[in-house]
A protein has these predicted regions:
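N-terminal acidic leader/helix
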Residues: 1-23
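Short alpha-helical "recognition helix" segments of helix-turn-helix
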Residues: 27-28
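Short, charge-rich amphipathic interface segments used for partner binding and complex assembly
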Residues: 32-57
């Protein structure tokens, strides 16, 4: 289960993307999390997913 706080979520997701997953889709599939919910939660605080960097920036 991922954290609800968007800034903690940002840190956790970016760390996992950097260290364990080659894409947001793979992270979401493996953790059984909604990609849309993660993207929206982080968009609400000004971050978007960059596939080229495999990070939310």
């Amino acid at each position: 289960m991922l954290p609800k706080d968007p800034f903690i979520l940002l840190s956790v997701v970016n760390t996992k993307l950097r260290d364990q997953y080659s894409s947001l889709d793979k992270l979401c599939d493996d953790l059984d999390e909604s990609k849309e919910q993660i993207v929206q939660a982080l968009a609400d605080v000004g971050y978007t997913y960059s596939p080229e960097q495999n990070q939310f920036v």
